[in-house]
Amino acid sequence: GQAIALEEIGISADGRFTTLDDTVIGTLFKLYPLEDLMAEEFGKALPASGLQLLEPAWKAVLSNKGILPLLWQRHQGHPNLLEAHFDTGAALPAGWVRKPLFSREGANIPLHLADGSWQESEGPYTGPSIIQAAHPLTSFDGNYPLVGSWVVGDHACGIGIREDDSRITKDSARFVPHAIIDEVPPPIAAGSGKIYV
């Protein structure tokens, strides 16, 4: 693998992504948001380029907050969903949060708590948003943990615990990943307990 700046990627005459020295890029892991890439002239070359993105294009659907009101419309009242609607720009009611469609790690989030108090985070995201019923995180000594889970098919594969000192989990949150494996490895050391990370 080789690291390359986005500005150093070009498109060849036959529509393939290349480095500055015209080496064809066959596989790419990128940190650039898919929604930004797809909105640019550069991104229009993706479908015919033969480039394999290690973050697949379908992930843009799941990372778009617009999926939340659509899920609510189709599965209203489901115990694993919070009520969500596309934002009309009206005042945010108590007990609700506003989230830009394309945002990450708690940026640009106003949270109107059920008790009437507010908490907000700043960030670079603008544009359309959704509103969602807020589910307040439990505080442990002023810290707010959030568990994210990964399920492939019907198998649990991992969890990530993010903890922030704010009710809005931001990019400064502490993070501990955990893998869920089918076979348990031997303990790290005798008497140290059986903790696997």
Positions of predicted regions on the chain:
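Domain-scale recognition of functional cores that engage charged ligands
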Residues: 1-197
